[in-house]
Amino acid sequence: MLNSRDQGNLHSGLCLWLCGFLALFKGSTGCESEEQLFHRLFAHYNRFIRPVENVSDPVTVHFELAITQLANVDEVNQIMETNLWLRHIWKDYRLRWDPTEYDGIETLRVPADNIWKPDIVLYNNAVGDFQVEGKTKALLKYDGVITWTPPAIFKSSCPMDITFFPFDHQNCSLKFGSWTYDKAEIDLLIIGSKVDMNDFWENSEWEIVDASGYKHDIKYNCCEEIYTDITYSFYIRRLPMFYTINLIIPCLFISFLTVLVFYLPSDCGEKVTLCISVLLSLTVFLLVITETIPSTSLVIPLVGEYLLFTMIFVTLSIVVTVFVLNIHYRTPATHTMPKWVKTIFLQAFPSILMMRKPLDKTKEAGGVKDPKSHTKRPAKVKFTHRGESKLLKECHHCQKSSDIAPGKRRSSQQPARWVAENSEHSSDVEDVIESVQFIAENMKSHNETNEVEDDWKYMAMVVDRVFLWVFIIVCVFGTVGLFLQPLLGNTGKS
């Protein structure tokens, strides 16, 4: 005999077993219902026939594009690679059923290869298959509405204009349409006016500014029929941060280093060395970034124009530096400074640039007279009898007025008397006088040579200062002008 506790446990176990059996029976019934429905729908189904009751009726296909990733933009080959979901919605009257007859089944997932599908292809495909593979399943509803959303990776052709690289915008389009059915057989309708970007992964180099879709009815030269297509235009903008940091800013620094060449004095001897160093650094930099710049012969990219501008800039600085050094080391023996050069470079430009000769500043600070007054041609000394007697009188006068002792005065009068008596016949005195005149002439010539050399050096300083400002202006305005082009170009397009 079972007690009441054992009877309760047995009753509970029987209930659980019965519930599990009923659930299993119901599940097997559901699977059987789905299998029966599948066999009933596709027993006599022909996937090659359009799903229309009347041959003259078109199949209305609703089409929508969803983008998940902008994988790559190849500027050289002009290809845009995208990861897309293509949503097709149409109605097939042959695939209807009553849910009440099949245990309430309202949806059925069927292989896409088992049903009729619109042959929607990408017209401007560049690489790979033009048509989407039918490996995914389609969602079939009891009223005959079919939703098929296959994923696809397309490499579409996209004519690109890289004139303003790396500040460029591109307009790439994806053109979808039926390849064999015309408008009378398939009518494409676009779902919404924008590309679905809810599941889009941001790209590190490109930003999608706008993605709009448009429907077109086109008559091609090959055929009499009108074909419908849906074209999505992707307006994308390049993110220039990478190129700005690694390309443009180093070029700017190199350009401004070139300007500093004209601030170096010519005497230091490092002007040409600095120019060559800057040119070599720019050349090495160009070799490094060659693979980064799009290689095309259709247009010159903006960054290519800037690199060319920088190269010309550095080359001109070397030419100007050589010219300045040539001026700096000129002498009266090799060159004569024309008057117009003196007027322009020694008077006009210094006043405009507020430059003054260092010698002039020294004279103002120390109150020194013009050195030219000290280098005037001395009067030729002529030792005539009249001059000699005058000189001797002055010497006797000095001797009389002095406080020298009489013994010493008597001894000092003897050389003077000897000079007076033997001046006419002394050849040594004449040699001394000629030597003094020779020294005076050499000093005068040396001073004049120094003045001319100082003028050439000062002219070199003026030319350096002129080109310093010229190169600063050209560098600033050239850089601003080049990089304002994308802004002005986009404003004009808008």
UniProtKB/Swiss-Prot annotation:
Cysteine pairs bridged by disulfides in the record: 158-172, 222-223
UniProt keyword Glycoprotein, yes or no: yes
Localisation per UniProt entry: Synaptic cell membrane
Region described as Disordered: spans on this chain: 399-423
Positions carrying Phosphoserine: 401
Documented effect of changing residue 280 to S: Increases sensitivity to agonists such as acetylcholine or nicotine. Alterates dopamine synthesis. Increases locomotor activation in animals with this mutation. Promotes drug reward
Top-rank lineage group of the source organism: Eukaryota
Glycosylation sites: 54, 171
Membrane topology field: Multi-pass membrane protein
Pfam families on file: Neur_chan_LBD, Neur_chan_memb
Keywords: Cell membrane, Disulfide bond, Glycoprotein, Ion channel, Ion transport, Ligand-gated ion channel, Membrane, Phosphoprotein, Receptor, Signal, Synapse, Transmembrane, Transmembrane helix, Transport
One BP annotation, GO: presynaptic modulation of chemical synaptic transmission
Catalyzed reactions per annotation: K(+)(in) = K(+)(out); Na(+)(in) = Na(+)(out); Ca(2+)(in) = Ca(2+)(out)
First and last residue of the signal peptide: 1-30
TM ranges: 241-265, 272-290, 306-327, 466-485
Extracellular side: 31-240
InterPro entries from the UniProt entry: Neur_chan_lig-bd, Neur_chan_lig-bd_sf, Neur_channel, Neuro-gated_channel_TM_sf, Neuro_actylchol_rec, Neurotrans-gated_channel_TM, Neurotransmitter_ion_chnl_CS, Nicotinic_acetylcholine_rcpt
One Gene Ontology cellular component annotation held by this UniProt entry: acetylcholine-gated channel complex
GO molecular function, one term: acetylcholine-gated monoatomic cation-selective channel activity
Tissue: Predominantly expressed in only a few brain areas, including dopaminergic neurons, norepirephrine neurons and cells of the visual system.
Keyword check for Phosphoprotein: yes
Activity regulation behaviour: Activated by a myriad of ligands such as acetylcholine, cytisine and nicotine. CHRNA6 nAChR activity is inhibited by the antagonists alpha-conotoxin MII and PIA, a small disulfide-constrained peptides from cone snails.
CDD domains: LGIC_TM_nAChR
Family the entry assigns: Belongs to the ligand-gated ion channel (TC 1.A.9) family. Acetylcholine receptor (TC 1.A.9.1) subfamily. Alpha-6/CHRNA6 sub-subfamily.
Function: Component of neuronal acetylcholine receptors (nAChRs) that function as pentameric, ligand-gated cation channels with high calcium permeability among other activities. nAChRs are excitatory neurotrasnmitter receptors formed by a collection of nAChR subunits known to mediate synaptic transmission in the nervous system and the neuromuscular junction. Each nAchR subunit confers differential attributes to channel properties, including activation, deactivation and desensitization kinetics, pH sensitivity, cation permeability, and binding to allosteric modulators.
Name under which the protein is recorded: Neuronal acetylcholine receptor subunit alpha-6
Organism: Mus musculus (Mouse)
Origin organism lineage: Eukaryota, Metazoa, Chordata, Craniata, Vertebrata
Encoding gene, per UniProt annotation: Chrna6
